[in-house]
Amino acid sequence: MSLSNSLGLLGRKVGMMRLFTDDGDAVPVTVVDVSNNRVTQVKTQENDGYVALQVTFGSRKASRVTKPEAGHLAKAGVEAGEVMGEFRVTEETAGKYAAGSVLPVAELFSVGQKVDVQGTSIGKGFAGTIKRHNFRSQRASHGNSRSHNVPGSISMAQDPGRVFPGKKMTGHMGDETITTQNLDVVRIDEARQLLLIKGAVPGSKGGFVTVRPAIKAKASKGAN
């Protein structure tokens, strides 16, 4: 995927619902609110060392904004948002927008397009290896005593004498950045600036997400 197509939108996960096709099939979709994405800065190769659009979404009280951030937003002429992000783009794409511009969803996405959605997964607290890493339980009987759901050996003996980093063990599960790839845009509500995306996206209701054109989108079967 070229950088010119990497411009996306910040949004909020509203929830899930279903749509019906003309054939009567039910399609599960996630509703994402991508309204009022404002450009807060156009980064250039000369000034910043790379080309990108800095975007903010949502609204925040002025009393909750730091003075440096307030000055930055005032320079762009936009109100403070709840979340801010960047999208790397080409100079041609960056030239189409200026600080204070609003990114309309209909210009960036289309029905049937493949998108990647990034968000923070739902936290599940402390979890064992069976739930966290899909391990299987050990024997229920036949010599097994009080070791039914333990992971088993986690390392070797004196050599190397330690547990290697990255070993799959018990620990905190969820609450991490997750990207779900190649989801279909089923419908676009221009009036309310909503994206209806097929399937589930990371995070809980009200969580912030980033929607980008899919980086691994496959060409259609009819393409040469």
UniProtKB/Swiss-Prot annotation:
One GO term (biological process): translation
GO cellular component, as recorded: cytosolic large ribosomal subunit
Record keywords, A-Z: Methylation, Ribonucleoprotein, Ribosomal protein, RNA-binding, rRNA-binding
GO molecular function: rRNA binding; structural constituent of ribosome
InterPro entries in the record: Ribosomal_uL3, Ribosomal_uL3_bac/org-type, Ribosomal_uL3_CS, Transl_B-barrel_sf
Listed Polar residues bias regions: 137-156
Record SUPFAM superfamilies: Translation proteins
Source species, domain of life: Bacteria
The keyword rRNA-binding belongs to this UniProt entry's keyword annotation: yes
Family that this chain belongs to: Belongs to the universal ribosomal protein uL3 family.
Purpose of the protein: One of the primary rRNA binding proteins, it binds directly near the 3'-end of the 23S rRNA, where it nucleates assembly of the 50S subunit.
Protein name as it appears in the record: Large ribosomal subunit protein uL3
Gene name for this UniProt entry: rplC
